């Protein structure tokens, strides 16, 4: 799914969507965080499995990693809740990106951050 979106930034590792084992195998002492598009919008509407998001949350907590949810396409009420991740209880992302739902057609985005 990277074709057409290259070159990528150095230092980022991509894993298959909803594959928690691949995530676990990529974490090392240089890992700063986990970035995921919670509902992938290219090639259809593909939400992350709830169990996957719960495990990502725990991995981030256990390894003191930042958890970053990209909700540019699905945030701000587009799934029936303010954020798509609100459909899963007790998720605590450190960063959430939002955009399309706040702009009303105007190109604007925002980051929601916690104190970490």
Which stretches of residues belong to each language-model region?
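Conserved N-terminal phosphate-binding loop of PLP-dependent enzymes in the Aspartate aminotransferase
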Residues: 1-116
